[in-house]
């Protein structure tokens, strides 16, 4: 049988760095050849060799309704008929902004952009402009896009300036980025004690989705809110992943914490390129043209993206939408854990509504970045390829979250569990815990 994905990947490497337009897609973390997809429908992907996969990537989070949802496709098609881009305001921008604010009351005003990276980058610029301060606090293992000031690894301790984690990022660009330990409030308090008058904002994922999946402890987020109140800094929630996925009001509604600013993306575009950031009215009013903080974008508020996003968010109001999604997520994750336990496979998991993370480790709970990176990457790599060979598409990295959509039914979940049970039953002995 001809492997068309392999042929396309070889060809792609002649024209694109690594053959892809986003690094993780190249399968570098797991090895092998990335599948080239030609079609997606509901909970399934179909590759160029006509192989069908149950999809637990969901375009890295946006496809909460599943692929090619009829209402979203119809809205996008109708919008396309009227033009692809105007460079001028359109009515759906207002409708989408209003619905975002209705779902997430902390967002009193919102600015549309084109990606999650733009959203976090612009939110930080706004925070610095409003406070007149330069330093920000981020957390090791939290990914906020590829803006220079956010491409920072943790130092050897909490009280360190950031060091660039990519060539091409000047040291001076990240000298105002301070790194603390996720779920460790003391590390944040120590930074405030040393740099209190200089810290403009804390930016944090309330549920971290790029060091596998690690939810923040409730008292950790409460403590961040209190520290920001105490020192006059802004609290920014990066809900690019969690916004409208873990709950209609995002993770902030689950934790009952009101951030000053929120970054959004993924779901609000229904699969189209989009991002947004918003928050308190008096802060957002500092944005140009109303205020002095400048931010702009040629394609911001794109009419097709606005139509797709609006159609998606409307579907989230369906009765029992989130309770059903949470139930399916729990059915999948608990089913995986029970099968791992029966086969003596060292595996743990974290999950929230519509999102999950699997870590090959004997630790019962993973709550810190250091634990996540100590998971057995080789075990994941083996598991990933066995799942792929059996028609289940997982994220090709041990440190990425998985996603489940409203289009997944118990049929897909149970098929996945049957495949996993079979894989675990015949796995190499190195996947087993000694008893």
From Swiss-Prot:
InterPro entries reported for this sequence: 4pyrrol_synth_GluAld_NH2Trfase (IPR004639), Aminotrans_3 (IPR005814), Aminotrans_3_PPA_site (IPR049704), PyrdxlP-dep_Trfase (IPR015424), PyrdxlP-dep_Trfase_major (IPR015421), PyrdxlP-dep_Trfase_small (IPR015422)
Principal subcellular localization: cytoplasm
Pfam families in the cross-refs: Aminotran_3
Chain positions with N6-(pyridoxal phosphate)lysine modification: 266
Pathway: Porphyrin-containing compound metabolism; protoporphyrin-IX biosynthesis; 5-aminolevulinate from L-glutamyl-tRNA(Glu): step 2/2
Catalytic activity, EC: 5.4.3.8
CDD domains reported for this sequence: OAT_like
Reactions mediated catalytically: (S)-4-amino-5-oxopentanoate = 5-aminolevulinate
Subcellular location: Cytoplasm
Entry's transmembrane regions: none
Gene Ontology terms for molecular function: glutamate-1-semialdehyde 2,1-aminomutase activity; pyridoxal phosphate binding; transaminase activity
Name of the top EC class for this enzyme: isomerase
Keywords per UniProt: Cytoplasm, Isomerase, Porphyrin biosynthesis, Pyridoxal phosphate
Example of a GO cellular component annotation carried by this entry: cytoplasm
GO biological process assignments: protoporphyrinogen IX biosynthetic process
Subunit structure: Homodimer.
Similarity comment: Belongs to the class-III pyridoxal-phosphate-dependent aminotransferase family. HemL subfamily.
Stated name of the protein: Glutamate-1-semialdehyde 2,1-aminomutase
Recorded name of the encoding gene: hemL
């Amino acid at each position: 049988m001809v492997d068309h994905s392999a042929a396309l990947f070889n060809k792609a490497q002649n024209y694109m760095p690594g053959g892809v337009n986003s690094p993780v897609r190249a399968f570098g973390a797991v090895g092998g050849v990335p599948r080239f997809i030609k079609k997606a429908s509901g909970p399934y992907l179909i590759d160029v060799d006509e192989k069908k996969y149950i999809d637990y990537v969901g375009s890295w989070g946006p496809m909460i309704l599943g692929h090619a949802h009829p209402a979203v496709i119809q809205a996008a098609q109708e919008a396309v008929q009227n033009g692809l881009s105007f460079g001028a305001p359109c009515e759906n921008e207002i409708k989408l902004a209003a619905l975002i604010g209705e779902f997430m009351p902390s967002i009193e005003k919102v600015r549309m952009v084109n990606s999650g990276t733009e959203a976090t980058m612009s939110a930080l610029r706004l925070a610095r402009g409003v406070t007149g301060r330069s330093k920000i606090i981020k957390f090791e293992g939290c990914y906020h896009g590829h803006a220079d000031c956010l491409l920072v690894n943790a130092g050897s301790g909490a009280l360190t300036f950031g060091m660039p984690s990519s060539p091409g990022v000047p040291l001076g660009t990240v000298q105002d980025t301070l790194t603390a330990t996720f779920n460790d409030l003391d590390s944040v308090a120590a930074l405030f004690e040393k740099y209190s008058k200089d810290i403009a904002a804390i930016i944090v994922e309330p549920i971290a989705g790029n060091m596998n999946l690690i939810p923040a402890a409730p008292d950790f987020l409460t403590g961040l809110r209190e520290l920001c109140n105490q020192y006059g800094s802004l609290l920014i929630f990066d809900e690019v992943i969690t916004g409208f996925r873990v709950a209609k009001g995002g993770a902030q509604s689950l934790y009952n914490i009101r951030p000053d600013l929120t970054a959004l993306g993924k779901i609000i575009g229904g699969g189209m390129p989009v991002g947004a950031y918003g928050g308190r009215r008096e802060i957002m009013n500092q944005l140009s043209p109303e205020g002095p903080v400048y931010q702009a974008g040629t394609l911001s508020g794109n009419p097709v993206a606005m139509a797709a996003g609006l159609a998606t968010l409307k579907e989230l109001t369906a009765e029992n939408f989130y309770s059903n999604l949470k139930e399916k997520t729990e059915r999948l994750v608990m089913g995986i854990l029970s099968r791992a336990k029966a086969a003596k496979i060292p595996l743990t998991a974290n999950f929230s509504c519509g999102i999950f993370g699997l870590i090959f480790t004997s630790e019962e709970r993973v709550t810190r970045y250091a634990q996540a990176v100590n998971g057995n990457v080789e075990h994941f790599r083996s598991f990933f390829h066995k799942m792929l060979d059996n028609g289940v598409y997982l994220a090709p990295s041990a440190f990425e979250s998985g996603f489940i959509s409203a289009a997944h039914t118990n049929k897909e979940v149970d098929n996945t569990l049957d495949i996993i049970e079979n894989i675990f039953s015949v796995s190499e002995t190195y996947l087993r815990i000694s008893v």
